[in-house]
Regions:
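C-terminal ends and interior cores of transmembrane alpha-helices
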Residues: 121-139
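Helix-to-loop junctions at the C-terminal end of transmembrane segments
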Residues: 98-117, 202-203
């Protein structure tokens, strides 16, 4: 890692020297960043879309680990720590990476406009895997693993869509990095808020 760090210190382009600005100038620019963000065409519809895109994930993913490890008598699947780590951690991560890579090829071939609806469906519908696991409570690790790996693959496949949507529809402009950061923050909020409520819903 140290060798890579030294290599990048020498090979990466140097940033141009920054001109020091007063606090008042910096504040005015920050205000302009916010104003220009909300002046973008269709921005409010875009923000609603971004917020809803990962809403299902927020409701499912915070409570899913507890569900998978909880006792069958309490409605869970009763996975051991070893099986949980193997299925949810190792196999799920590999499936996520493969899904992301294939999604990149899919979008580059057909374009984001033609693929966005299918990406929304691919991202959200597989969360029904957890509903099916809760209903049938299978004990067979192959069935459990197949369902979770499928969900993670679909998650990786669909996640690329929302990332590219923010980059192509919201970020372009004078303050593209700041505007992308705003959109990304809202997207993460759509996961955090439902995640806080998911425990209450699960025990209601």
């Amino acid at each position: 890692m140290l060798a890579l760090a030294l290599y990048h210190m020498r090979s990466l382009p140097r940033e141009a020297a920054r001109v020091r600005r007063s606090a008042d100038e910096s504040w005015k620019e920050l205000v302009q960043v916010f104003i220009s963000f909300f002046e973008k065409k269709h921005i409010y519809l875009y923000l609603v879309f971004i917020f809803l895109y990962r809403l299902g994930e927020g409701l499912a993913m915070k409570i899913a680990p507890i569900f998978l490890k909880d006792e069958v008598a309490k409605g869970g699947i009763a996975l051991s720590n070893e099986n949980y780590g193997l299925i949810y951690g190792t196999a799920g991560t590999i499936a996520f990476i493969l899904g992301s890579i294939l999604s990149g090829y899919y979008i580059s071939h057909f374009g984001l406009k033609k693929t966005l609806f299918s990406l929304v469906c691919i991202f959200n519908i597989p969360f029904a895997v957890y509903l099916l696991l809760a209903i049938f409570q299978p004990s067979n690790l192959w069935w459990i693993g197949t369902g979770i790996v499928f969900e993670y693959f679909s998650y990786g496949f669909g996640f690329v869509g929302i990332t590219l949507f923010m980059m192509q529809q919201i970020a372009p402009g004078k303050y593209q990095m700041a505007h992308y950061a705003f959109a990304n923050s809202l997207m993460n909020l759509s996961v955090m808020v439902p995640g806080m409520l998911s425990g209450k819903l699960a025990t209601a």
